[in-house]
Amino acid sequence: MKTKELSYYTNGIEAKNTVILSQSITLVESSKKEHQVLAQQIINHCLPLSGNSIRIGITGVPGVGKSTFIEAFGTFLTGIGKKIAVLAIDPTSQQSRGSILGDKTRMDNLAVNPDAYIRPSASGKTLGGVGQKTHETILLCEAAGYEIILVETVGVGQSETEVFSMTDFFLLLMIAGAGDELQGIKRGIMEMADAILINKAEGDNLIKAKQARREYANALHLFPAKESDWIPHVELCSALQNTGIEEAWNIIESYLVKTKTTGYFEKNRKRQTKDWFYKFLNHQVLTSFYEGNGITEQLKEIEQQVLNGEISPF
């Protein structure tokens, strides 16, 4: 990727040019040192322009209909005058390190909506399945004037924890009768969820969905109270039939009013910023260590000694 002057990117972002925004995000995601230097300058410039959006994490097991929901939800939001950015984290092959990056094809309306910006990003081997630079991408999207940032996760492993640590509201999508094998994933993310939506509540599945709503609502009472003092909602929706979408937004608005009034919203944002500072610091320290003179060769020697049982791995 051939780079340009800093002002090209910063002026483009402030002018809400999506092509230049995409180019800037590509620089942020790049592992090349020259790109990283320029990307940091772009982020530093955009930092004062960021922080004014609502960041919403959306997760759920594969097959729950996340992309269909985001298509319906995003269309509703732009319909009431909001500008939204969708950061869709795609599953990545651990062997080929390739990515499907198919979210734009699954969000036909949003892909051509002038008030929506979709940025697929490979999850790679990053802890949690969330693109390593997702937090910086959020800042750039905010600087470009997007009022609502939707972060969709791969819905497996530790990805929910990562998204929870960079968003204001955490939305869990579920479907009725998903099977007992998913209970482990459900419990872990249910404790973080600010709202649970039972998707695909339509047709013959409506009765099952209502039963699931009762079960999840009962289960939530068993969890400790949230620090925000917010009581999570459990509601039904059908992204396919466009029902329950406006209600989902009303829940989020109620959450924002409550947490901004109590001061929790600002407190949580500052805590997230501090956490990400230390994550970045740890990453930089490790990177510097592995790039040190002769480190790779020394590690290989030590590794072989460990494998031979000559020294302890601890």
Task: Please give the residue ranges for each predicted region.
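Long, well-ordered amphipathic alpha-helical subdomains in the mid-to-C-terminal portions
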Residues: L21-Q23, L236, E247-F314
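Conserved phosphate/pyrophosphate-binding and hydrolysis machinery centered on Walker-type P-loop NTPases
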Residues: E14, V28, K32-Q36, G63, ...
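Alpha-helical scaffold elements adjacent to nucleotide-binding pockets in ATP/GTP-utilizing enzyme cores
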Residues: I100, T137, E162, M166, ...
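Hydrophobic positions on the alpha1 helix immediately C-terminal to the Walker A/P-loop
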Residues: F69
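Hydrophobic anchor at the beta1->P-loop junction of P-loop NTPases
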Residues: I56-I58
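Nucleotide-state-sensitive switch-loop elements of NTP-binding domains
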Residues: E5-S53, V64, F73-S159, M166-F169, ...
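Canonical P-loop GTPase G-domain recognition
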Residues: A195, A201-T261
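Flexible active-site lid/hinge loop adjacent to a nucleotide/diphosphate
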Residues: A178-I207
